[in-house]
């Protein structure tokens, strides 16, 4: 049998910052929704000049430190115990992936332009879920649903498997119907989508633990991460994986790794950096 070609990291354009107009309309939309008032208050605090300057200073420092330790996706999978050929998911599931792309092409909402749809490392998520024979998985951040699809394809053969996803409603974009649009109907029976901010949605999702894998890709602030990481870590089973996107943004990932006394695997993912921790 001819070996399948290895994974090659997919380039991405990086995470764009939303324009001031989009940020303002987002805040106004959240203010008009009573259920989102707690998130609205936290978002206002993060937009204070001091908070922004502090995060940007930490981003420059942490990016350099994480870059030094980063490896490619295939090397990371090997280090985490996965052997054998690894394919891009668009090759492993060509029909499902193409169908998802067709759904994206119908979407009138400029997700990427607004900085809320940076692609997750779907190969990393998929193959780690398969390696764990994951039964319960938790993620924050959905957008169009590529990470959700990668996870659902990995757990779909397990009896009673479930993915819990937490994602803030995109009120300003009238985009509710497009969240998770790439997930096909036949996989939605394994999926629970909590349309809430992390601090309201995560406690609900965590009630279905323990989890085999937790993936964080939502609130990028240090405060938001340092609130969520310990709760996700506590909900992980021994041997489970905590994965976080964009770990070079600020000090939160390194701070948390030091708190739990674990050394992460750092992965290059296009222009982003992804961190993986294994729970002992």
Regions found by a protein language model. Give the residues of each.
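S-adenosylmethionine/decaboxylated-SAM
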Residues: 8-15, 20-27, 111-280
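Class I SAM-dependent transferase core
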Residues: 79-121, 126-131
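General structural signal for secondary-structure boundaries
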Residues: 4, 37-39, 63-70, 79-83, ...
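Short charge-dense sequence patches
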Residues: 67-80, 94-105, 176-184, 203-208
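N-terminal acidic, proline/glycine-rich, low-complexity intrinsically disordered segments
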Residues: 1-7
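N-terminal auxiliary segments of SAM/dcSAM-dependent transferases
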Residues: 8-90
């Amino acid at each position: 049998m001819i070996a399948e070609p290895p994974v090659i990291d997919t380039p991405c354009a990086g995470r764009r910052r939303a324009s001031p107009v989009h940020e303002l309309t987002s805040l106004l939309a959240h203010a008009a929704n009573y259920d989102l008032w707690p998130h609205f208050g936290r978002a206002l605090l993060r937009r204070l000049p001091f908070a922004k300057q502090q995060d940007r200073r930490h981003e420059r420092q942490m990016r350099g430190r994480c870059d030094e330790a980063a490896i490619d996706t295939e090397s990371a999978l090997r280090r985490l115990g996965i052997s054998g050929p690894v394919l891009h998911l668009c090759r492993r599931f060509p029909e499902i992936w193409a169908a998802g792309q067709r759904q994206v092409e119908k979407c009138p909402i400029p997700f990427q332009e607004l900085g809320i749809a940076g692609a997750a490392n779907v190969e990393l998520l998929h193959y780690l879920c398969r390696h764990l024979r994951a039964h319960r998985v938790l993620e924050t951040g959905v957008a169009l649903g590529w990470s959700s699809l990668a996870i659902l394809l990995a757990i779909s053969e397990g009896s009673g498997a479930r993915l819990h996803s937490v994602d803030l409603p995109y009120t300003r974009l009238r985009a509710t119907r497009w969240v998770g649009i790439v997930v096909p109907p036949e996989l939605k029976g394994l999926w629970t989508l909590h349309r809430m901010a992390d601090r309201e949605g995560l406690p609900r999702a965590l009630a279905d633990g323990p989890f085999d894998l937790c993936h964080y890709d939502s609130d990028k602030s240090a405060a938001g991460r340092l609130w969520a990481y310990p709760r996700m870590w506590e909900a992980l089973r021994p041997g489970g994986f905590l994965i976080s996107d964009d770990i070079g943004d600020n000090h939160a990932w390194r701070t948390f790794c030091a708190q739990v006394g674990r050394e992460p695997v750092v992965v290059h993912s296009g222009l982003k950096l992804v961190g993986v921790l294994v729970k002992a």
